[in-house]
């Protein structure tokens, strides 16, 4: 068998999903309540990076891009993450605030998909979170001009040591190019794997002040 033939065997990689179902009678009226329950269970199951989410944005040519970012806060106003404001995703969101998030909790056979709009956080919100980060992470935020091309990793490491020396006294200041976004939820879909590929999917869609809930075919 050639290497190419071996690679083609991925078509046969599959497993049954047997960890349980999701039924309408178990659904709360608010999607954030179910999200919180599932996130807590993901943390209790000791999944690697349970707050990791795929963030999808589009550029001015409608070309989609994805990357993994950590969720840092959520409440009834939305889901929050932080980033370099010079990054590609930040530029995308300045031009088009439409955004999609995905939480892939594979070990629990679950996914949560979110669509909505992103808006910049206030400087006060960003400052409060920034100073809660480990000091080296604060310095690291100063080092990288995110998404720019660099010649070698050594450039970053040298800059980090330089700034660590510079900021050795007192607080590390908040970079003007570092901030965050809040995603206001318009839709939230919960996916639970099921046997024979008969997965359970429920879509919460905002309907004025309430939420409309629909079961979707897998």
Curated annotation (Swiss-Prot):
UniProt pathway annotation: Cofactor metabolism; pyridoxal 5'-phosphate salvage; pyridoxal 5'-phosphate from pyridoxamine 5'-phosphate: step 1/1; Cofactor metabolism; pyridoxal 5'-phosphate salvage; pyridoxal 5'-phosphate from pyridoxine 5'-phosphate: step 1/1
Binding site for FMN: 67-72, 82-83, 88-89, 111, 146-147, 191, 201
Keyword terms: Flavoprotein, FMN, Oxidoreductase, Pyridoxine biosynthesis
Cofactor(s) needed: FMN
A GO MF label: pyridoxamine phosphate oxidase activity
Binding site for substrate: 14-17, 72, 129, 133, 137, 197-199
InterPro entries listed in its UniProt record: Pyridox_Oxase, Pyridox_Oxase_CS, Pyridox_Oxase_N, Pyridoxamine_oxidase_dimer_C, Split_barrel_FMN-bd
GO biological process: pyridoxine biosynthetic process
EC number per UniProt: 1.4.3.5
Comment on bound cofactor: Binds 1 FMN per subunit.
Reactions performed catalytically: pyridoxamine 5'-phosphate + O2 + H2O = pyridoxal 5'-phosphate + H2O2 + NH4(+); pyridoxine 5'-phosphate + O2 = pyridoxal 5'-phosphate + H2O2
PROSITE patterns linked: PYRIDOX_OXIDASE (PS01064)
Family in the record: Belongs to the pyridoxamine 5'-phosphate oxidase family.
Quaternary organization: Homodimer.
Annotated function: Catalyzes the oxidation of either pyridoxine 5'-phosphate (PNP) or pyridoxamine 5'-phosphate (PMP) into pyridoxal 5'-phosphate (PLP).
UniProt-recorded name of the protein: Pyridoxine/pyridoxamine 5'-phosphate oxidase
Biological source species: Enterobacter sp. (strain 638)
């Amino acid at each position: 068998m050639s290497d190419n033939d071996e690679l083609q065997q991925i078509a046969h990689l599959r497993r049954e999903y047997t960890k349980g179902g999701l039924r309408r009678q178990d659904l709360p009226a608010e999607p954030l309540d179910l999200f919180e329950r599932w996130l807590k269970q993901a943390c209790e199951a000791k999944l690697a990076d349970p707050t990791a989410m795929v963030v999808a944005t589009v550029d001015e040519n409608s070309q989609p891009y994805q990357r993994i970012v950590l969720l840092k806060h959520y409440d009834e106003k939305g889901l929050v993450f932080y980033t370099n404001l010079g990054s590609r995703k930040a530029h995308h969101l300045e031009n088009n605030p439409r955004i999609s998030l995905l939480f892939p909790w594979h070990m629990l056979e679950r996914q949560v998909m979110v669509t909505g709009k992103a808006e910049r956080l206030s400087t006060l919100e960003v400052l409060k979170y920034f100073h809660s980060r480990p000091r080296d992470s604060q310095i690291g935020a100063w080092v990288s001009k995110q998404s720019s091309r660099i010649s070698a990793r050594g450039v970053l490491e040298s800059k980090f040591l330089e700034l660590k020396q510079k900021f050795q006294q007192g607080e590390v200041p908040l970079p003007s190019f570092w901030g965050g976004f809040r995603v206001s939820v318009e839709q939230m879909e919960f996916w639970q794997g099921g046997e024979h590929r008969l997965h359970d999917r429920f879509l919460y869609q905002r309907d004025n002040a309430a939420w409309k809930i629909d079961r979707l075919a897998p």
